[in-house]
Amino acid sequence: MGLEEIVTDLKGKRVLVTGGAGFIGSHIVDVLLDESCTEIVVIDNMVRGRPENLAYAMARGPVRLVNGDIRDTKLMTTLVKAADVVFHQAALRITHCVAEPGLAMAVMVQSTFDLLELCVKHNVEKVVAASSASVYGMAEEIPTTESQHPYNNRTLYGAAKAFNEGLLRTFNDMYGLDYVAFRYFNVYGPRMDIHGRYTEVLIRWMERIDAGQAPIIFGDGRHTMDFVHVQDVALANILGAKSGICDEVFNVAIGVETTLLQLAQSLTKVMGRESLDPVFAPERSVNPVPRRLASTSKAEKLLGFRARISLEDGLRGLVDWWRAERHRTGAAVHAKAAGS
């Protein structure tokens, strides 16, 4: 299917975004503001999400935040019944899945099944689902295309995402439920979780660099990732929703391989601390995949999607946001203390 067949319009649609107050979900909501949707409903249990992530969107458009859990069948029935399009972003982090595997199965597998059943029952037009490069494990094909098999994955998180992709294909065959799914590679940018227990390595590094300490690299620094800015990820989701394409999965990445050492050096440069050389620690075993590099040709060909934000520009924006956020939250803490 070619670009000339991209015909779907989100104008006037009622949209539901699960996990929509989180890192990626809130950026999807921001982009949806320009699509003239009738209503954008966000459900989030605020484990990873924050109301502040939606402040911009809620001030500009028809955005409604529901503080709830996707495991709440009664609530989800009400929300899905009123939706035309569903963006399914709710999930746990890969490290959280390791810590609480039972919860991971309930949130990431059972709740996805329940959601898809509701989408069929209430005639949802399209599901736009978040998947992950974790489904590949250590890919045998570099750059990795979407046809790479998922059998090298050795994480519960990746297994859950692969199973969810299978559910989407099955529901498309059995019930005609339209969907597109996106395998996110290494997403970064504003609104990364700086407050939670399972924070990203970039956040830890910024904290250390800002304090004049060297960033810690677990391993030898030669592991690679394919970093993609969260605003580009949001754009891919909107293009997928608006396209006439369904029953397809796409890599979302920039298509550039960056070592952890290169990332640390880029970050110290952006933060004005180039003299801080990274220090190395024993490698962790949560997700020991030595290489990540995506083929982005399928998304470019079928969706017209190409990541636009370079790593250096993206890191600069991330640092600016992080410093402003630290200043804002620090000021709020001081104000609260002064009033107590």
Which role does the model predict for each range below?
Residues 1-187, 309, 317, 321, ...:
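N-terminal Rossmann-like NAD(P)+-binding domain of SDR-like oxidoreductases, especially those catalyzing
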Residues 35, 209-340:
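C-terminal substrate-binding subdomain of Rossmann-fold SDR/epimerase-dehydratase oxidoreductases
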Residues 59, 152, 194-198, 256, ...:
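Residue-level signature of the cytosolic catalytic core of signaling kinases
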Residues 99-101, 156, 192-197, 290-291:
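Short, solvent-exposed loop/turn segments at secondary-structure boundaries
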Residues 105, 154-162, 196-200, 227, ...:
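Short-chain dehydrogenase/reductase
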Residues 142-143, 194-203:
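A glycine/serine/threonine-rich, flexible loop-to-helix segment
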Residues 163, 167, 171, 201, ...:
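Hydrophobic alpha-helix immediately C-terminal to the catalytic Tyr-X-X-X-Lys motif of short-chain
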Residues 189-191, 286:
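Short beta-strand->alpha-helix junction loop in the catalytic core
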